[in-house]
Amino acid sequence: MTDFSDFRNNGYILKRNLFSKDEVSKLIRYIEDNSEKEDQARETFSSTGKLNITLWNHPSDDLFGKFSTNERIVKPMEEFLGDEVYHYHSKVIWKKPGDGGFDWHQDYGYWYHNACLYPDMGSCFIMLDKATKENGCLKVLKGSQKVGRIGHGVSDTPEQTADLDRIHELEKRHECVHIEANAGDALFFHANLLHSSDSNKSNESRRTLIVCFNTKSNNPYKEKGHASYSPLKISSYNSIMEY
């Protein structure tokens, strides 16, 4: 199978060694040394505990921007989604020892409410540390993007969680895949793919940069506080190490 057919059939594709050890180390140092996004940091809570998340809508001309607009991410995403894409938002998740995970959800379960009519959206999940079952790596239900959008926050389900009755049934029909990966690997996945993660039971932090994209043709039909279409200035392959 090609990457395109894997993405269409399974809802995701894992690209090994998309970024080098030197590139990842440079970003980790930048995260640790740079406080310019501290005012955007927040804690979020799930059924398994808390997580630290920093989120921003517009890529700036800094090291974060060199990653989030890099041709290694943007060009495959345009191939997978079949359209020009633009930066929807990016976030750094810092899962410290003992921190919780995320309940089962679809990104489009949230983004639907941001006036995006279609699920023609996707994310690139870049590992900055080794991801294992022990430290709460991402889990996906393979092929679950084909189900379509599922209600979130229905009945007694938390607002950020997909309908648990449907999840229980889908778990019987779709393989649950733990995305164990190394630093520098990157997971591309569709906005309707069901995914979750467990708590970090290790003694080490797990850091991730997630870059989310919308397609040009799916520009929100009204203002909802998230990024509308703006042409993306794609960064070159070498722009990270040249920064």
Predicted segments with their positions:
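Generic beta-strand structural signal
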Residues: 83-90, 100-102, 120-126, 136, ...
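Residues immediately flanking
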Residues: 106, 128-130, 190-191
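Short hydrophobic-aromatic micro-motifs
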Residues: 14, 124, 187-189
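Short, conserved beta-strand element in jelly-roll/cupin
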Residues: 114-133, 180-181, 212-215
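Short, charged/polar surface micro-motifs in flexible loops or helix N-caps
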Residues: 73, 97-99, 130-133, 146, ...
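Non-heme Fe(II)-dependent double-stranded beta-helix
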Residues: 2-10, 15-115, 153, 224, ...
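Conserved double-stranded beta-helix
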Residues: 145-243
